[in-house]
Amino acid sequence: MSEDKVITAHITETGQSAYAVAIEVNGHSLKGDEPESFGGGNTGPAPYDFLLASLGECTAMTVRWYAIQQKWPLEKVEVTLTHQKVGKVDKFEKTITVHGDKLTGEQRQKLIEIAAKCPVQRTLEGKVEITTV
């Protein structure tokens, strides 16, 4: 993503449950909610579900992009993530599985290294400014 591109998301309560929302972003419509155990109706993913999905999606796409650039025989990439809040620290764990019988051990290792360079991960690890108006 270029540095000057602005992405806008619009979120509106739907009334389906106490926390249910409709999400419009970049021409896509999504639903969000909290699980019933948190007072929601579980009509869609919760905010941290979306955060994990964003990190996983970006990771898979970054690995695929790199394999394409290198013309490596990557058949499929899978990303499994967990999130846990420990005190004031958010801990994420990513498990990357790269499939491809013709990939060398060196290529597999490089793809795992590249997985840590996805833009969403860099955003989460970097300096972020949020302005509320």
Name each model feature, range by range:
Residues 1-53, 61-133:
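Extended beta-strand/beta-hairpin segments
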